[in-house]
């Protein structure tokens, strides 16, 4: 890959790698809680504390593919920097959701709701980027240049 192409995706790759570390942390918490109450073997059922950790991890894993798709789509089709920033915010609220779920379930609600909004924002960024691509393809009009012109005046 050339340097310019790398520069266009490096922030997205960093956010993706941070999300992998976060997933490993969540998995470690599940394993630790399982071994604490079930001995050496991993069981999917157990104490209420284990059930909360396992469910919180599973909920995060369920949303993870969607997050990766909209993160990379928004970064590639629209703009890398806002997509990477939104991705970092999503990881922050996902951490808040996970930790909140381990306490009372009502503590996890703000993280869950804000996480859904960030996913929606990334999705809309992706749609805007794809729409701009087709504007260029069919009409030769780059909407992104109009936005840059308006914002610099």
Curated annotation (Swiss-Prot):
- Give the ranges annotated as intramembrane: 108-115
* Membrane-spanning parts: 9-30, 53-77, 81-102, 116-128
Alphabetized, the UniProt keywords read: Endoplasmic reticulum, Leukotriene biosynthesis, Membrane, Nucleus, Transmembrane, Transmembrane helix
Q: Name one Pfam family in it.
A: MAPEG
State its location(s). Answer: Nucleus membrane; Endoplasmic reticulum membrane
Gene3D superfamilies, alphabetized: Membrane associated eicosanoid/glutathione metabolism-like domain
Q: What is its main location?
A: nucleus
Q: Which GO terms describe its molecular function?
A: arachidonate binding; enzyme activator activity; glutathione peroxidase activity; glutathione transferase activity; leukotriene-C4 synthase activity
Which GO terms of the cellular component aspect does the record hold?
endoplasmic reticulum; endoplasmic reticulum membrane; nuclear envelope; nuclear membrane
How does the protein associate with the membrane? Multi-pass membrane protein
Cytoplasmic compartment segments: 31-52, 103-107
Q: Which residues lie on this side of the membrane: Lumenal?
A: 1-8, 78-80, 129-153
Q: Which InterPro entries match?
A: 5_LipOase_AP, FLAP/GST2/LTC4S_CS, MAPEG, MAPEG-like_dom_sf, Membr-assoc_MAPEG
- List, in alphabetical order, the GO biological process terms annotated in this UniProt record: leukotriene biosynthetic process
Report quaternary structure and partners: Homotrimer. Interacts with LTC4S and ALOX5.
Q: What does this protein do?
A: Required for leukotriene biosynthesis by ALOX5 (5-lipoxygenase). Anchors ALOX5 to the membrane. Binds arachidonic acid, and could play an essential role in the transfer of arachidonic acid to ALOX5. Binds to MK-886, a compound that blocks the biosynthesis of leukotrienes.
Of which family is this protein a member?
Answer: Belongs to the MAPEG family.
Q: What is known of its domains?
A: The C-terminal part after residue 140 is mostly disordered.
Q: What protein name does the entry list? A: Arachidonate 5-lipoxygenase-activating protein
Q: Which organism is it from?
A: Sus scrofa (Pig)
């Amino acid at each position: 890959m050339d340097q310019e192409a790398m520069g266009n995706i490096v922030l997205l790759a960093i956010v993706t790698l941070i999300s992998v570390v976060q997933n490993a942390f969540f998995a470690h918490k599940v394993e630790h809680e399982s071994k604490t109450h079930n001995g050496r073997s991993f069981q999917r059922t157990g104490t209420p504390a284990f059930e909360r950790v396992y469910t919180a991890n599973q909920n995060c894993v369920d949303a993870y593919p969607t997050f990766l798709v909209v993160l990379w789509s928004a970064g590639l089709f629209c703009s890398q920097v806002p997509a990477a920033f939104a991705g970092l915010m999503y990881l922050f609220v996902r951490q808040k959701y996970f930790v909140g779920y381990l306490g009372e379930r009502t503590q996890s609600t703000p993280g869950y709701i804000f996480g859904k909004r960030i996913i929606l924002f990334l999705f809309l960024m992706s749609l805007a980027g794809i729409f701009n691509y087709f504007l260029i393809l069919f009409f030769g009009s780059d909407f992104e240049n109009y936005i840059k012109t308006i914002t610099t005046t």
